[in-house]
Amino acid sequence: MAPPTGKRVKGVQIFRPFVYGTTARPFDEKTNPKPPGIPDDHTHSWTVFIKGIDDVDITYWLRRVQFKLHESIPNHVRMVEGVKGQPFQIHETGWGEFEITMKLYYVPESSEKPQTLYHHLRLHPFGRTEEEKEAMRLNGGEVISWVYEEQIFNEPYEPFYDILISGALPPSASTLKDGGGGGGSGAATPTSANTPGASSSKGGNKKGHERSHSRASVSTNKDGKNNNESKEEPFVIQKSEGGVLERSAMIPLVNRPGQPFSRETEQLEIQKLKEAKLKVDEMKKQMMEELEKKQKRLEALRAESAKAP
């Protein structure tokens, strides 16, 4: 159902990066002991999650997530409500791999329909080559299966658009802001051209801009009423350790422990694609040369056959 205004911001797309996947660890007496009460046949502990890039908050656009696990697991359909600054996640134990269904429910202001993601739980080392599998084995047995994704909001409704562009906040300020949906007291409202991750149909600026904001300091009594009026205390936006601002489409510049997705990762993937293209071009060249030799040989045989009595 559309918001009261019922109007969409035409010609605008806003995207927000996030990460989803699973992390699994085999039970081990020293590094990962099995908790009491866990069935004997369970060999691993694992976590399935959806979170923001560089662990920034995403509850301003994602309200809740429904995780559908294997039917053999008790309470296999679970709803996780968003908690500001924390990932949507479930911790479990088991012995087998299976496909997990994740249904994303957006904040009411978006009026967007739920979307579904699918992810295969990985308990054992995997990869395209034996070297990749061996690298996982050397990682203390921890098996990481994460996916980088971008949520695109096409022509969002005006109330939701205002939330999305309500200003990027440094991660340290997330606990200072009230509520998980709006921009907070004193938040600036830049245009889409100045908002990371906002673009028009003609193309937009995806770079972040530092802006001065203010936060309200309010004390309350037991009844929840204000004991004094809001006091504005200005602060300057700063980048997080990974170079990411909250409520933005930024991603880290370099990789860090526990944060494998960055511009550095992107460049490495681009380099792999370039190397693969060179290899394919070389294979294509060799194939064409072999084909040309075979064609000449075929023409020679046809000529000999024509001369034969």
UniProtKB/Swiss-Prot annotation:
GO cellular component: cytoplasm; NuA4 histone acetyltransferase complex; nucleus; Swr1 complex
Basic and acidic residues composition bias: residue spans: 222-234
Sequence ranges of Basic residues compositional bias: 204-214
All residue ranges annotated as the YEATS domain in the record: 8-167
Database matches in Pfam families: YEATS
Major localization class: cytoplasm
Record-level Gene Ontology MF annotations: histone binding
Compositional bias (Low complexity): 187-203
Gene Ontology biological-process annotations: chromatin remodeling; DNA repair; regulation of transcription by RNA polymerase II
Keywords: Activator, Chromatin regulator, Coiled coil, Cytoplasm, DNA damage, DNA repair, Nucleus, Transcription, Transcription regulation
Coiled coil: 265-309
Subcellular locations according to the entry: Cytoplasm; Nucleus
Keyword Transmembrane annotated: no
Sequence segments annotated as region (Disordered): 175-241
Comment on protein domains: The coiled-coil domain is required for assembly into the NuA4 complex.
Summary of subunit composition and partner proteins: Component of the SWR1 chromatin-remodeling complex and of the NuA4 histone acetyltransferase complex.
Function comment: Component of the SWR1 complex which mediates the ATP-dependent exchange of histone H2A for the H2A variant H2A.Z leading to transcriptional regulation of selected genes by chromatin remodeling. Component of the NuA4 histone acetyltransferase complex which is involved in transcriptional activation of selected genes principally by acetylation of nucleosomal histones H4 and H2A. The NuA4 complex is also involved in DNA repair. Yaf9 may also be required for viability in conditions in which the structural integrity of the spindle is compromised.
Homology family: Belongs to the YAF9 family.
Name the UniProt record assigns to this protein: Protein AF-9 homolog
UniProt organism field: Neurospora crassa (strain ATCC 24698 / 74-OR23-1A / CBS 708.71 / DSM 1257 / FGSC 987)
